[in-house]
Amino acid sequence: PGFSTPDWAKGAIFYQIYVDRFANGDTSNDVLNREYIYINQPSKKIDDWYRYPEEMDVRNFYGGDLQGVLDHLDYLKGLGVDVIYLNPIFVSPSNHKYDIQDYDYIDPHYGKIVVDEGNTLPDWENNNMNASKYISRVTDKRNLEASNEFFIHFVEEVHKKGMRVILDGVFNHCGSFNKWMDAERIYENQYGYEKGAFVDANSPYRHFFKFYN
């Protein structure tokens, strides 16, 4: 690919959206309290959008999603926006989503959860292998495919308003939740997934990483 600036970007007004903190358009896909453990602490659902952020706020979720952005397209168009720039939206355990878990799919917490099985973690449980609701939400292909389809619809609607969409791609690093690594052992027993490099020395992804004693 070339590195020249496309004509449509020259002089365009870009509006950057941190999706979790923009608007909650679909409460059925909200991250729940203790849905999983992230950096040694449970995920937390925040209802008060006017509270001060915590010092370690990456596991706190306000419920913003793509439906919330979709609901505000006329507002964005009215501001004179030409391009909507979305912070990462692929499957990830953090609210910033710079530690992508699955590069192939939009996070169902931002898209669509059509199959919602399992349970949140009890107070005494800190092992993500037992985070059955989270595992169902982010590994069930029905949720993942529905979320990708919704994103296609989202982009089509943005285009109808005369605006464009660009994504924040994060391709040079991932996190322990990533399905190629699977240090959290989320994918280990799920149908349709290869073993992660952390789980199995014979994993097809083993050569993606370097391991040291």
What are these model-derived regions, one by one?
Residues W8, A12, L79:
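Structured loop/turn residues at beta-strand edges in well-structured enzyme cores
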Residues P1-W8:
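Extended acidic/polar, glycine-enriched regions
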Residues V19-D82, I89-N213:
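Substrate-binding/active-site clefts of carbohydrate-active enzymes
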Residues A12-V19:
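Mature N-terminal segment immediately following signal peptide/propeptide cleavage
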